[in-house]
A protein has these predicted regions:
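Polybasic (Lys/Arg-rich)
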Residues: 113-146
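Short, charged/polar micro-motifs that form catalytic or ligand-binding hotspots
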Residues: 62-70, 148-151, 179-183
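Acidic-basic catalytic patches of nuclease active cores, encompassing PD-(D/E)XK
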Residues: 1-22
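Conserved pre-motif I regulatory segment
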Residues: 134-180
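Motif I (Walker A/P-loop) of helicase-class P-loop NTPases
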Residues: 185-189
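Hydrophobic helix-cap positions at the C-terminus of alpha-helices
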Residues: 4-5, 80-83, 168
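Mg2+/Mn2+-dependent nuclease catalytic core
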Residues: 20-117
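Short, highly selective alpha-helical patches that border small-molecule cofactor pockets
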Residues: 1-2, 73, 77, 162
Length: 189
């Protein structure tokens, strides 16, 4: 699909990595991914092309076939528009129907402001979950900081095991520990 697009659009860039930081309420989101393609249309408007392969019947593939595909491409377009200070962009979904070897394309035009608003709407849906995750991490970290080691000193063999675990974490590799019950293996690790 991308090779054919390169023939059609000389400036077609495939697999373009994009990363953008978006703030929603008090949460900062880093959104990233690879746009399947980005090119300039004949009218000078930049297009983000998101390619999907499907075995669904071609008759079922409509512009509203999969809203999540639009969402993905819109996020890429919002990032690209912001990074390149573009006032408008087009988002194109390209579906390749494998059984019929049929290509279907759908396009939508957006201003940079509309793209930003679309991303904010997505983040509004995701924010409650993200907020709970942030709160849980804060509580976990606070509990871990307050946690006391259960014994006043290392038990026999415990310090050596903790040192070996540290070395494996630092250098990579695997470690197999065999020690009697009650030595404090879990706490050492």
């Amino acid at each position: 699909m991308q090779r054919a697009a390169v023939k059609e659009h000389a400036d077609y860039a495939a697999e373009v990595f994009l990363r953008g930081i978006f703030a929603y309420e008090e949460i900062e989101f880093t959104l990233e991914g690879r746009a399947d393609g980005i090119f300039t249309a004949a009218d000078g408007v930049t297009v983000v092309d998101e390619i999907k392969t499907t075995a669904c019947p071609a008759a079922d593939i409509t512009p509203d076939f999969a809203p999540e595909h639009w969402a993905q491409a819109i996020v890429y377009a919002a990032i690209y528009a912001a990074q390149h200070e573009l006032e408008e962009m087009r988002v194109q979904l390209t579906y390749f129907q494998v059984d019929e070897e049929l290509i279907l394309r759908f396009e939508r035009h957006y201003t940079a402001q509309q793209l930003q608003e679309e991303v904010e709407a997505l983040l509004a849906e995701y924010a409650p979950w993200a907020r709970r995750a942030v709160e849980w991490k804060k509580a976990r970290n606070s509990d871990l900081q307050a946690m006391q080691f259960p014994f006043p000193a290392y038990r026999p063999g415990q310090r050596a095991m903790a040192g070996e675990v540290y070395k494996v974490c630092r250098d990579g590799g695997r470690l197999l520990c065999q020690a009697p019950t009650g030595i404090g293996k879990s706490m050492s690790v």
